[in-house]
């Protein structure tokens, strides 16, 4: 008789994403702010298809200069409910795809992540077998939205 143990591991997909203060961009467009003064952050975000929104940490919030947001209730992965800050005014860029969104603010320097809403808005897909994020191959020339 053979016995064996199957060990399952979950691969994590990360991608280099740029976050931009949306309000700084508006000020730049209105001639009130030089392009070099637009606050940005670029780095690795975990791509989490089980999460809904973008989640940044306090360090990223401060670097982007985002204003204090509102407290909102969230459900964590373990099923517990907690209150967390939600801020607005974040532009997300992956390659030539962009979206505008709010973000949950995680404590201190917790690992940031990007959830389903920004992925859908930018028409991006996760390739789990390769731990890669890429443009939807059905729409390589730009995001396609359905209004049905």
Labelled PLM ranges:
Residues 1-148:
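Pepsin/retropepsin-fold aspartyl endopeptidases
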